[in-house]
Regions:
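Conserved alpha-helix/loop element of class I SAM-dependent methyltransferases that forms part
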Residues: 1-18
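Class I SAM-dependent methyltransferase SAM/SAH-binding core
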Residues: 21-71
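A conserved beta-strand element that flanks and buttresses the S-adenosyl-L-methionine
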Residues: 83
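A short His-aromatic
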Residues: 89-90
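A short glycine-rich, Lys/Arg-flanked "PGG" loop and its adjoining helix->strand segment in the class I
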Residues: 95-110
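Conserved class I S-adenosyl-L-methionine
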Residues: 112-134
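Short alpha-helix
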Residues: 140-156
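Conserved Class I S-adenosyl-L-methionine
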Residues: 155, 159-226
Length: 226
């Protein structure tokens, strides 16, 4: 998640802010990009203290906060931009997360959001989420575009921009990113060997002599205002 046009877009959407928070910052790439876009104060927030430390160390000028995405330690209307990039599929209660963002972003402020999304077809949705959980047990769920837009609107956000992009993933690199064990790799491969009808086409699966070589997933980008 270190770079890409999608990262640049999220940072640009936040660029008019004076104080921004990057929620579930991970290694801090998004927080660093927002700081680079000209925002004076950027807080890198994550539930894992070691991730906050990494983010602050890698981006001088970024502040750190250990924070649960669904219980943010900020007062109401205390930031004028919030971002969350490719992390929300780990959250147990996404509606509560969106409501928390709405609480801390001031009226007129921006929420720049990106996450993996599932197809509307229930079988393909279940296939994608099964594969993701077998790869990474911390994966909770990739939701649909409709789910996310509904949660945002219910929390009082106005949807300004939406875009769904498709990213091709190298299969071995994708597994290696989470240091998947041999057993997890076996279970992921088993799912790809017995997919529901239409999955190979929906996820642009390519195979070779040794099995899956690549597949694609979709990501939703949203710019919303409070």
């Amino acid at each position: 998640h270190r770079e890409g046009d999608d990262l640049d877009r999220l940072a640009t959407w936040c660029s008019d802010a004076d104080r921004a928070v990057d929620i579930a910052t991970g290694a801090g790439h998004t927080a660093e990009a927002i700081l680079g876009a000209g925002v004076d104060r950027v807080v890198a927030a994550d539930a894992a203290p070691e991730m906050v430390a990494t983010a602050v160390a890698s981006a001088p000028g970024v502040e750190g906060a250990v924070a649960d995405a669904e219980r943010l330690p900020f007062t109401e209307d205390s930031v004028d931009a919030a971002a969350c990039r490719i992390a929300a599929h780990h959250f147990p209660d996404p509606a509560a997360f969106v409501a928390e963002v709405a609480r801390v972003v001031e009226p007129g402020g921006t929420f720049a959001f990106e996450d993996n999304v599932a197809p509307d077809d229930d079988r393909l949705d279940e296939f994608l989420n099964t594969v993701e959980r077998r790869r990474d047990p911390t994966h909770v769920r990739s939701h649909t575009v409709t789910d996310w837009l509904t949660w945002l609107e219910n929390a009082g956000f106005t949807i300004e921009t939406t875009d769904v992009i498709t990213k091709s993933l190298d299969y071995e690199e994708w597994l290696g990113n989470v240091d998947a064990s041999a057993e997890r790799r076996r279970r992921v491969a088993a799912a790809f060997e017995d997919p529901p009808d239409g999955a190979a086409e929906a996820f642009s699966v390519t195979t070779g002599d040794d099995g899956v070589e690549s597949f694609a997933n979709r990501k939703l980008l949203v710019r919303a205002t409070r």
